[in-house]
Amino acid sequence: MRSLVWAVIATLIVLTPFSEATSSIASNNEEFKQNVRVASSSLEQKGTIEDSVITRKLQSDSVKKGDSTGLEERGGLHVPTIHDNKIVQGFYKVMRYLRQKLGIDFLLTRLRYGKNGSHQPNMGYSRVDHYH
């Protein structure tokens, strides 16, 4: 009986520091989570403020330049691409005309599908050879 009491007392003595450590870790963890929440919310606010400042700057720049298009519907500026080039647009018009008149887009078909129309570009096989 006496050994059982000493075993319980020894167990309590040994386990007490662990329970204190786990409770302090848990409180530190909650404090850490709170700090992360505060930091992330302040970053989000800062980001939205910076975004709105940049958007206003871009809007004022487009108005100053007399840009008739201004901002696009989605709120972003139109970024020029190769498709805005007049020569490329002319090429597309010619290709559309040829496609309508000839029934095929012969140049792009040849580039896209290879020399004998197979769906594996430039492999040199006929369509029949592909399935064997």
Curated annotation (Swiss-Prot):
Record keyword Glycoprotein present: yes
Intracellular or extracellular location(s): Secreted; Host Golgi apparatus
Signal peptide: 1-21
The name this protein goes by in its record: Secreted RxLR effector protein RXLR-C22
Main localisation: secreted
Functional summary from the UniProt entry: Secreted effector that does not suppress pattern-triggered immunity (PTI) in plant host.
Species the sequence originates in: Plasmopara halstedii (Downy mildew of sunflower)
Motif RxLR-dEER, residue numbers: 56-74
Induction trigger: Expression is up-regulated in spores.
Keyword Secreted: yes
Chain positions carrying an annotated carbohydrate: 116
Domain topic, free-text comment: The RxLR-dEER motif acts to carry the protein into the host cell cytoplasm through binding to cell surface phosphatidylinositol-3-phosphate.
Sequence similarity: Belongs to the RxLR effector family.
GO cellular component assignments: extracellular region; host cell Golgi apparatus
Keyword annotations of the record: Glycoprotein, Host Golgi apparatus, Secreted, Signal, Virulence
